[in-house]
Amino acid sequence: MYSYIKGTIETIMNDSVEIESNGIGYRIYTPNPYSYQIGEFLTVYTYLHIKDEVLTLYGFREKEEKELFLKLISVSGIGPKSANAILATGSVSMIAQAINKGDAKYLTKFPGIGMKSAQQIILDLKGKLVVTEYSGNYLVLDEVHDALLALGYNEKDIQKVLPKLDSTKSTNQLIVDALGIMTR
């Protein structure tokens, strides 16, 4: 029903943001609400989920995120909350690359995704996803992610930093770069 909403971020919550558009406030569940800034004017690509007479808006900064979300919820056993959690923990290109390579182990790192769900995702989506923005090795960024977690950084901060890294560098250099960004 709603393809996108243009508006200003008014409130940021743990799992969602509130956007005001033409005097109407929309609560939109988003993978990484803390990546938004209060007062920021933007376009959020949305999906309206209807279940048991409850309307829930899910929103994404990029069309690619929304497209992957829609494909994930088409998989048996994966609902909007699980798909949102997957997108909150990994980038679109890393997830797509893992699915296309059949890497079930990588997919089980996402909250609520066990081996059975990971295999179902691969079965249903392998070969149907196009990896556009990320051509590097997703395993390198996965190692950086794990290293930052081990150093005590939280998931939200890590997810803000990973897209800023140059995946062509070595793992050690990427960790140094990530730490430099995080300490600014």
Which role fits each region the language model picked out?
Residues 1-74, 179-184:
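Structure-specific DNA junction-binding interface
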Residues 55-60, 80-99, 120-134:
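Amphipathic, charged-and-aliphatic alpha-helical interface segments
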